[in-house]
Amino acid sequence: VTQEQRFEQRIAQETAIEPQDWMPDAYRKTLIRQIGQHAHSEIVGMLPEGNWITRAPTLRRKAILLAKVQDEAGHGLYLYSAAETLGCAREDIYQKMLDGQMKYSSIFNYPTLSWADIGVIGWLVDGAAIVNQVALCRTSYGPYARAMVKICKEESFHQRQGFEACMALAQGSGSQRQMLQDAINRFWWPALMMFGPNDDNSPNSARSLAWKIKRFGNDELRQRFVDNTVPQVEMLGMTVPDADLRFDEESGHYRFGEIDWHEFEDVINGRGVCNHERLAAKRKAWEDGAWVREAALVHAEKQRARQVA
């Protein structure tokens, strides 16, 4: 039995692939790309929310938002550790993101214009992320699957607090309700785009599904998100900004309109509203933090020298 056959056998038997196991080079590269993008998304995702920490309406909201952004930093670091088990260096993949050679989730290139956006990001954006990530708890690569189990627990808390913030606005004044509807109007379609291109137009999906890196296609996950979320929008007394949305009695699913794929292409190729701003902020943070990294290395070297002595 060749190594390749043994690998395929383990995938077929749903046995997790671990870092020390043999794996095809393309499998390793696909995982580095996916886990790296996922980690970058957590780190860049701190920016739109961090924008509102100093302007949160109450101390309670501020404390929740601080904790949420802190969680996202932790998720990013956790995922970089998972990527490093595949033999890449986190500095290398982080630098690729700063240089625009690696992507992060398209959703974070939209601005957060009002407090309602923060609730809607927690509810819709983290809601879409959970649909994606719950499926990844059974991904074929062990360290990634285990990271997902931990992250999903925290993400579900993020989503609940986002929905609760939206609920407070929905029960508020006319202008608060209007602010919430406006945020839903702006984030609904970008949230649907988070699942990636349609399956017949997704360059990496078929191979990722065959290797069980992904367990479901983009379209199936997007449908699941719409089915979960439309009743929540209605419960808040809000409207989904889609004239074509209707419930299909026969299939039990909601049918929804066509996504603006030109906008999606623009955003993932660096032409979104905030692409330039997000990367500039991360580059500045990387440069401003250089002294911390240098100090940590010098400290580690001193500790090592003491132990040797």
Language-model region placement:
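Helix-loop segments that flank and shape redox-cofactor active sites
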Residues: 22-27, 45-67, 129-144
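Alpha-helical scaffold segments that form or flank carboxylate-/histidine-based iron centers
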Residues: 27-38, 56-75, 118, 143-155, ...
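Acidic, low-complexity proline/glycine-rich segments
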Residues: 1-18, 40, 92-102
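Acidic/His metal-coordination segments adjacent to aromatic residues that form catalytic metal sites
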Residues: 16-36, 96-122, 139, 172-176, ...
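Extended, helix-rich structural scaffolds rather than catalytic motifs
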Residues: 178-309
